[in-house]
Every structure is written in structure tokens, then in C-alpha cells.
């Protein structure tokens, strides 16, 4: 599922004269130190690598189409005092585990409104750490938690407090030989562009060719959605 890259349908990608690559096929031969770097896409991939490259690049511009919910990972290491407490009170370990299960089970089903409200509150509290009001507003989601794939990070929002990091929300018109032209007429010049645009996860059999009678393609037959009798049999194809 996560091996078929998606490249955005933006005109001019091949016209760019600098380095460019997909985040899932990272080009380690490209030295990003002191470079001007543009990142298209700010979801699950970007929140992982953007904080890692921000300290080394000269300028990092992230192009965002839709603001996502980015909430704390809640993955802090246990302190020595906490470890001593759990050793002395093993019954508390089970209570903690049960509470963790309850929260994550509610999160996965998106049915516990109280849990969802707490998560949104935690996300907004972390977002409030972004000092620039305009950037903070651009990063604020306009949809409830769970409508899009939720993201978990403790280090993404802090990069926007760096002087060399900017968030661009104007739509992209095209890629140019020098960089990215946005719909407001501004050309953003870069040395390297990273496409953090995800994977093809919704097309059936996108990495596998199944042929039926007379050379028919199962991928074409299922282009508008997969259908099979009892979930196992499709007319005209091997079953």
C-alpha cells in the first residue's frame, strides 16, 4: 500500500533546474545544508522530516493546502519517580494500561465525544506555542478531529518559531525552472524541492495486473469500485 508514490498533478515539475525528489525516495546524495528548500505537502511524512532538516537548511518553505490536526504524541519517557511508584504499586500499572486502552479505543472509533474534545484541546494548546498569529491561524484546522488522518508530533509546530521556516498557503500555479509559482503571482525560488505528497492507497490492484478473458483488466473493471459475488468471485476473471 505504501510503496506506490503519488506525484501531484502540478505543471512544470520536470522544468525545475534544482534537485527534486519524493520524500519516500529520499535522495541522500543531496546535501541540504544551507539550501533553500521547498516542501509540497504537510501531512504524515512532512511532520517527520521537516523538523529534522529545519536546523540545517538556509530557508524552509512548507506549502500547505489543508491544515491538519497535529496533536501531542504523549510518548514521554517515564521518570525515575514514576518507575519507583509503579514498582511499589503494580496494580497501578494495570490501571494505567486500561486507561490507555480506553482512550485509544475511543480514538480509533471516533465515538467518544469527550475524548475527542480532549484531544482537540491538547492539539490547540500545542498550536498556541506558535508565536506568529498569522501562521498560527493558517495552521488551525477547520474540521473536527478525525475527518482527515490525524497526525501526532511533539516537534512539528515548534519549527514555525524558527526565523528560517515559513508556511505558504497560497495555491500552487506551477513549478518553474527556479522554484514554485503560487497563484498570488509570487515565485518562490529554491535549490531543492521535496514532494511530500503521499502514496496511492485507494486504487484497487494499483501494483498488480490481473488479466481475465480476452485480455480484460481487473483494475479497469474495478475502476469505479471493487465488486465481487460473495466477495470472492468476479465474472470473466480467475477466481
Model segments located where?
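Glycine-rich, N-terminal phosphate-binding loop of Rossmann-like dinucleotide-binding domains
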Residues: 1, 24, 184, 197-198
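Rossmann-like dinucleotide-binding core of oxidoreductases
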Residues: 2-129, 165-166, 217, 235-239
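A conserved short coil-to-beta-strand element within the FAD-binding core of flavoproteins
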Residues: 26-29, 144-145, 159, 163-183
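Core beta-strand elements of the Rossmann-like FAD/NAD(P) dinucleotide-binding domain
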Residues: 31-35, 183-192
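Generic beta-strand/beta-sheet core signal
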Residues: 40, 63, 168-170, 183, ...
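Short beta-strand to alpha-helix junction loop
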Residues: 110-119, 144-155
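Short, surface-exposed acidic
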Residues: 130-141
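Glycine/threonine-rich phosphate-binding loop and adjacent beta-strand/alpha-helix elements that clamp
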Residues: 192, 196-239
Amino acid at each position: 500500500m505504501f510503496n506506490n508514490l503519488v506525484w501531484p498533478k502540478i505543471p512544470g515539475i520536470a522544468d525545475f533546474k534544482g534537485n527534486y525528489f519524493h520524500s519516500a525516495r529520499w535522495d541522500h546524495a543531496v546535501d541540504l545544508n544551507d539550501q533553500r528548500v521547498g516542501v509540497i505537502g504537510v501531512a504524515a511524512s512532512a511532520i517527520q522530516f521537516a523538523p529534522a532538516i529545519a536546523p540545517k537548511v538556509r530557508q524552509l518553505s512548507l506549502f500547505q493546502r489543508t491544515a491538519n490536526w497535529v496533536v501531542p504524541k504523549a510518548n514521554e519517557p517515564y521518570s525515575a519517580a514514576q518507575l519507583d511508584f509503579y514498582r511499589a504499586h503494580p496494580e497501578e500499572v494495570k490501571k494505567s494500561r486500561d486507561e490507555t486502552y480506553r482512550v485509544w479505543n475511543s480514538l480509533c472509533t471516533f465515538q467518544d465525544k469527550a475524548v475527542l474534545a480532549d484531544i482537540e484541546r491538547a492539539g490547540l494548546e500545542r498550536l498556541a506555542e506558535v508565536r506568529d498569529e498569522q501562521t498560527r491561524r493558517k495552521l488551525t484546522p477547520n474540521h473536527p478531529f478525525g475527518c482527515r488522518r490525524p497526525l501526532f508530533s511533539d516537534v512539528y509546530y515548534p519549527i514555525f518559531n524558527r526565523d528560517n521556516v515559513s508556511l505558504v498557503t497560497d495555491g500552487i500555479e506551477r513549478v518553474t525552472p527556479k522554484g514554485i509559482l503560487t497563484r498570488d503571482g509570487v515565485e518562490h525560488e529554491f535549490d531543492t524541492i521535496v514532494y511530500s505528497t503521499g502514496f496511492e492507497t485507494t486504487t484497487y490492484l494499483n501494483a498488480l495486473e490481473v488479466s481475465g478473458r480476452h485480455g480484460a483488466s481487473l483494475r479497469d473493471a474495478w475502476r469505479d469500485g471493487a465488486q465481487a459475488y460473495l466477495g470472492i468471485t468476479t465474472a470473466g476473471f480467475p477466481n
